[in-house]
Amino acid sequence: PYPILWVKGQHLMQLPIVAPAPVVTAHADVFRDLFENRCQFQHFQNYLTGLIVLDNKSLANITRCVLESADKTNLSRFFSEAPWFQERVNDRRLVYLLDQTKEIRGPKADALLILDDTLCEHVGSLFDYVDRHYNHGNDTYPLAHNPVTSHYVSGPVRFPMDLRLYRRYEECTQWETFVHQHFPDRSIPKTKKERARFHKEVDPILLADPNFQKLHHQFRTKIDLGIALLEAAIQHKVPFRVLLFDSWYLAEELVSMARYRKKDWISLLKKNRNLETNSFVLKDAVGTPIRLEGPHIAVEELVPLIPPTAYRAVTVGDKTYWTFTLAVRLPGLGKVR
């Protein structure tokens, strides 16, 4: 019988996985020596095949569709118990991809390393480190993992590089458990502002607990993880010149590391970020300098002052963008364009 997938009250027939996909077998031998035996290597190929051919890419569904074994726990045990090392597999993958694409990649000066994070939503809470993470797109808090990822782009070549799992501070440190332990008579606020004030009150006391302090030092911000991904790409000798990231990662620590590593960087700037007014001169439509009051001006206040004649058309593919360029200083970041 073919596996059946239930989707919102409907059942859809899925084709079984009877053998690894040809694209998998064509490249899998590169990884063969990283596995202890043939069974492990076969599970590895079946899992990759499931990720490619199945719409539902969960481990449970891939296991359901693999027909080679009556024991449907084999693939699960491969991930949870088998002594293989995913870091070595990814290292080998990157070496292989860079070697296979060296003739078609673009110049190093035009190559990008893109940093971003995403939400991998889950139905259940049995996964390690699953938590409620904020979704900026729809203002919700789904149950999910929140990996920070790096992606490589060079001409026609593009592939995922690496990831680091972000864990919220309260989940990483088991904060609520320690609060109940040290403050059994206190209730934990639910609103964001009240919770932040409560943190300031109780955290210094919690940090005196060696067990909490140990977990506290294990916490990594998304900026920390982005820097780790940048360092990993450099360690792998990935040829790129430009680091690309959104406004969430526009922080002094990441920018400083990019400069230290001699990488150009491109980011978005939130409209409420301040610019130092003494670092630039803005002129009106007739060329007269516009006087700006105070040491700082927010981006959202500056944009309406830019005359329409100052914009220039830039065409990329079939799209035209109207752009304005200005070199300014941002507090904490220094001079940027």
Feature names for model-found ranges:
Residues 2-23:
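Charged, often Cys/His-bearing segments associated with DNA-binding zinc-finger transcription factors
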Residues 17-45:
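Basic, short loop/linker segments at the boundary and entry of helix-turn-helix/winged-helix-like folds
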Residues 35, 44, 54, 61-69, ...:
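Phosphate-ester processing/binding pockets and catalytic centers
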Residues 35-39, 51-125, 132, 232, ...:
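Electropositive nucleic-acid engagement tracts
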Residues 48, 81-188, 310:
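Active-site-proximal, Lys/Arg-enriched surface segment
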Residues 54-56, 105-106, 127, 138-144, ...:
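A short catalytic or substrate-binding loop motif that flags glycine-/basic-rich loops and adjacent residues
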Residues 184-188, 196-337:
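An internal, acidic/charged active-site-proximal segment
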